[in-house]
A protein has these predicted regions:
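Acidic/His- and Gly-rich active-site-bordering loop/insert found
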Residues: 2-111, 132-137
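Short helix-capping segments at alpha-helix termini
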Residues: 49, 133-137, 164-165, 285-292
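A structural signal for isolated positions on well-ordered beta-strands in alpha/beta enzyme cores
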Residues: 54, 79, 142-144, 296
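Intrinsic-disorder/low-complexity, polar/charged segments enriched in Ser/Thr/Lys/Arg/Asp/Glu/Gln
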Residues: 64, 140, 257-261
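Fold-level recognition of mixed alpha/beta catalytic cores in primary-metabolism enzymes, strongest
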Residues: 105-108, 113-114, 118-224, 233
């Protein structure tokens, strides 16, 4: 068996740096994403390594890709996954051009260099190193570079549903983790609640039904709801937070409409459908106490919590590798 240092050579480390710099220079701030040029650049580099590359178009300006080094088929594939988009650079001034990809002080500076074009570049270089070493693979090595992770997971949803993806034994996602292995992730359940009332002049509020006050009642009820869960040893507990509130048109007009968004973070073992039912039951109870109470709830985002057992062979192997290579 070849040692890691015989496979991943200094030129591959240099390639990873170059790939990261070039990807940072391609603007993929999401929204709107516009990941197509980054996907095309990634595809061109992986094709040079001998990978079979398939572009996965979403819109005229957005795409993901699948690259594959073929194995013998004796084992399921190992899937590398990384996203092409990045969050906006914000309003604060940068010390370096956020789209410059400048190498300074031992770091690559730019939007997405950590989250997660650096991880994507490392996977590209690793794939190149394995291809050049001509190591027989028991299963395929697949790299999925996806669009839209920062918003709606457009690319990941599309790629995971493709029939040609094939069986996968493990997924590696090199989000910035300071070389720690993360084996669990909280789920996300975003809800939008809307209350509807009856407008009236502010001088005669008794003639209307105040939708904002209805929302206040619901938020108070939400704080008292107990959502069944077990504390997770790695992730902690379930959380809920009302993070936006919008309603009313003028100070002297009783509002007839109000919306709020709720960010819930779930832990393994929780059922999102059961949580939604509990919220809907809370609405029913409020309506029973106040016949004029009108509310509806809508799911904005639904991602279930995930975890891999610590004793899983892939986790154990990754832990061994990290121990060997991290100073």
């Amino acid at each position: 068996m070849m040692e890691l240092k015989e496979i991943f050579r200094p030129r591959h480390e240099e390639a990873a740096v170059k790939y990261c710099q070039e990807l940072v220079r391609i603007k993929t701030v999401n929204p709107p994403g516009d990941e197509l040029p980054a996907a095309e650049y990634t595809a061109s580099q992986l094709e040079r390594s001998g990978a079979d590359v398939e572009m996965v178009p979403h819109t005229a300006a957005r795409a993901s890709l699948l690259a594959r080094l073929r194995g013998s088929g004796r084992a399921p594939a190992l899937l590398y996954n990384g996203h092409l988009d990045s969050v906006p650079p914000g309003d604060e001034p940068w010390s370096h051009d956020p789209l410059g990809g400048e190498l300074a002080d031992g770091r690559i500076w730019g939007r997405g260099s950590a989250d997660m074009k650096g991880g994507l570049a490392a996977m590209m270089a690793a794939m190149q190193a394995l291809a050049e070493a001509n190591i027989p693979l028991a299963g395929d090595l697949i790299l999925a570079a996806t669009a839209g992770e920062e918003t709606d997971s457009l690319g990941a949803i599309s790629i995971s549903s493709r029939p040609n993806l094939g069986p996968v034994q493990a997924v590696v996602i090199p989000e910035p983790s300071s070389n720690e292995i993360f084996i669990a992730e909280k789920g996300v359940l975003w809800l939008e609640l809307a209350t509807r009332g009856k407008t009236a002049h502010g001088s005669m509020p008794e003639l209307g039904h105040n939708a904002i006050m209805m929302m206040v009642d619901f938020i108070s009820a939400l704080r008292e709801m107990e959502f069944s869960h077990k504390e997770h040893p790695l992730l902690g507990g379930f959380s809920r937070s009302v993070n936006t509130l919008s309603g009313g048109v003028k100070t002297n007009v009783v509002p007839d409409f109000c919306t709020a968004t709720i960010d819930m973070r779930t832990v393994p073992g929780q059922d999102h459908a059961a949580i939604l039912r509990q919220v809907e039951e809370g609405i029913t109870r409020l309506k029973g106490r106040r016949p004029e109470f009108q509310a509806s709830v809508r799911v904005l985002k639904d991602r279930v919590p995930v975890e891999t057992p610590p004793e899983d062979p892939a986790v154990q192997r990754f832990a061994q590798i990290v121990t060997e290579i991290v100073p």
